[in-house]
Amino acid sequence: MTSILKCILIHGDNAMDYHISKSRYCSAVQCPKILWLKKNMPEEFDSSVVNQAVLDAGSAVGDLAMGLFGDFVEVPFGNLSDMVAKTKQLMDLQTPVIAEASFSTDGLFCSVDILKVLNDTEVELYEVKSSTSVHDIYYHDAAFQYYVLSKLGYKVRSCNIVHINNQYERNGELDIHELFTIKEVTADVIALQHEVEANIRMLREYMKQIEEPEDDIGEHCFSPYPCGFFAYCSRHLPTPNIFQVAGARTTTKLKCYRKGIVSFEDLNTCDLLSGAQYKQIEHELFHYPPYIDKERIGEFMQTITYPLYFLDFESFQPAIPLYDHSHPYEQIVFQYSLHYIESEGGELKHKEFLAYPGEDPRRKLAEQLCADIPLDVCTTAYNMGFEK
């Protein structure tokens, strides 16, 4: 599922300079300038927007989903021509289930996560996602694959999105048929075919441009994925600007931008932000000292009693449940750090817990935490909602 994406991230686009892949196509649906910049100005890409944990989860989920329909043959990732040739060989052998089946025609390329081969000309297409719901961009992803296979003469009997069922609870061996939900999207994909054709035609012309296209900032800079070229495309804005206001909604930032309210000087005279956001603006403009709400701090300090404990957790969220009685993406706490002071002015002491790799940490952590924190003591945490 993620092998082609990995190729783009790790090796660049050179391997597909003469192809529109499904990854490229989906990027173009978001904003065609992404592809133009990747090809012509790749050094401007901010790789910090790439969430490696999400990519790793996607790879693990994709690998697991390959077994949904029993035995399968996976097309090894490598040279694209070799992948296409291997797929044809497997299709000729009537291999029932092919993972990463790869197809190319007329400068278009796609790998299908799971392809069920019904006969010489009929197939079913399954696109695997590690999310817990079906997002709009997934329809475009499947629609591009449908378009490529149809151009090659295959009859796509059904298009499906396979995604995580967040209601699944693991008990014993992992049940992948309960872990995954399959949503048929054939009708939606067929309805998008004219749009796919128009997008491909537009993209081919767009990529011929020698001069940098003049596309403005908009929702596409943030959705469906944050764009790694946003810093470059917003370089003409003053620093600081509306997009650097902490806590403001993206819709609010874009509303201000479209009204020409961009600099902090502009923002200081508008009424579209919150009180806390104006404090940030005033601090920057007038060099105010850090804002300290002494009254609220005083009220909080009145609630403090001793012994006093300071608790912090660390957790992870596996897409695939690792332990019994856990769900996909459930927070699994594996570490805590506990500082405490027994009396006012006393020495700051420390206790901690760190789980052993490979073990379910939940019970041992809970038992030690109960032993480390007495009942009815004052316990503080930076993120009370999470630590509770």
Predicted regions and their residues:
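Short secondary-structure boundary/capping segments
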Residues: 44, 174-179, 324-331
